[in-house]
Swiss-Prot record:
DNA-binding region per Swiss-Prot/TrEMBL record: 39-62
PROSITE patterns according to UniProt: HTH_ARSR_2
Protein name: Transcriptional repressor SdpR
Induction notes from the record: By Spo0A during nutrient starvation through its direct negative control of AbrB, repressed by AbrB during regular growth when nutrients are plentiful. Represses its own transcription. Induced by expression of SDP (active peptide of sdpC).
Gene that produces this protein: sdpR
């Protein structure tokens, strides 16, 4: 879960997630929305993949990235349970 919070702590990675809400995209498609190098985009994508927040799959010669909302939902549920448990202690 720490990887998830690290992955979503960066504004560039949050923007990537926001883009992927619209559907699967290639790294090149994603890179068009940023003024940073393609290797930097790849680095951000790898961090998101390691946290399992996104997944990739090959279609022909292209690799498409997609959002994995299950991991995000699990992390949010944990956080909400943590907060709610703290409220009960007051």
């Amino acid at each position: 879960m720490n990887n998830v919070f690290k992955a979503i702590s960066d504004p560039t990675r949050r923007k990537i997630l926001d883009l992927l809400k619209g559907g699967d995209m290639t790294a090149g498609d994603i890179a068009e929305h940023f003024n940073i190098s393609k290797p930097s985009i790849s680095h951000h994508l790898n961090i998101l993949k390691q946290a399992e927040v996104i997944s990739d799959h090959r279609k022909g010669q292209f690799i498409y990235y997609s959002l994995n909302t299950t991991v995000l939902q699990d992390s949010i549920n944990w956080m909400l349970n943590f907060i709610n448990k703290g409220d009960n202690d007051l």
